[in-house]
Amino acid sequence: MPTPITTATVQPLQSLPSAEEVIGHWDWSPALGTLHEWIQSQGIHASQVVVLVPFAQMMSQATAAWGQAFPTSFVPRFETTRNWAGAAGGPAIQADDLTLDVAHDSVVAAAMLASVKIRGLDAHWRRTLAPQLVETAHELATLVASVHPDARSDWLAERLAVLNLGSGDGFQRWESLIGTMALTWAANSQYPTDVLWHPVLHPSVAALAAIPGLADDPLTSALLAHWPNVKRLPPLAVRTAENGSPNPARLLAADDAQTEAQMAAARVIAHLQAGRVPVGI
C-alpha cells in the first residue's frame, strides 16, 4: 500500500515589524536624549559607550529607538551586565564555584556538608540542609557579585563576625551553620560578571551609562561607582499604543491571597496579549 503523502499549508511571509513595534511600549526619549547630549559633551565616540539596560529584550528596542531618534549617529552598545560579560569573556569557573545551576550546586553543597564534622550532623541532617544551603547561597550571589572581587575577603570577614558558628540550640544551630557556609561559598566563588570590574580589560569602552529598571540592581550601581566615566540616565516610562502617553497606575484590591494571585495573573496575561513586554512583577 503506497505511503500517503502529507501536505502542509504554506503560510504567507509576514512583513517586517515597524520601528514602533520593535521599540515597544517604552518612551525612550528622555533617556536617549540625555545620553546623546552627554556623549557629545564628553567628546566620546558613541560606539565606545556601553549602556546597561535592565532586560535583554530592551537591547534591540534601545538600538531601534536610537536609530529612529538619531539616524545619522553611531549607535552605543546597549547591553545587560550578563550579556556584556559573556561577550568580554569571563573568568574560568572552578568546579566548586557557585554557578546558580541547582543541579551543579546541589552536588557541591552535599560535598561541602559531608566535609563538616559537627556533633549531630548525621546523614539525615546533611540531606535536609543541602537544599537550604543552595537556596541561601543563591540568594547571596547577586549581592556578592556586586562587591569588587578584591574586596570580598574583607566583606566576608565582616559578615562572619556577626555569626557564631554552632551557637544556639536546636534548629538555630543549623541556621548558623548554613549562613556561615553560604556566605563563605558565595564570597569565594568567581562570577561571569567579575570581568566587568576591570576597565583596563575593555580598551574599546570609553564610558559606561545605565538606564535604571523597576528596582535597583546592586551590580549596575556598583559598576557605576567603580568605572571612571559614567552616566546615570533617567528611567523609562511606559506609553500606550493609542496616544503615546504613560499609562496611569492602577490599584486593585483583593479579598484574599488566592484572588490576588488570580488578578495578578490576569493582568500579566492582558499585558502580554497587548504586546507589552517585559512585564515586571
Where are these regions (language model features)?
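Helicase P-loop NTPase motor core
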Residues: 2-51, 55-56, 241-281
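Alpha-helical scaffold elements adjacent to nucleotide-binding pockets in ATP/GTP-utilizing enzyme cores
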Residues: 61-65, 87, 222-226, 263, ...
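Conserved RecA-like helicase ATPase core segment
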Residues: 140, 203-257, 266-270
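Conserved beta-strand termini and adjacent loop/short-helix elements that scaffold enzyme active sites
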Residues: 23-26, 79-84, 235-238, 254
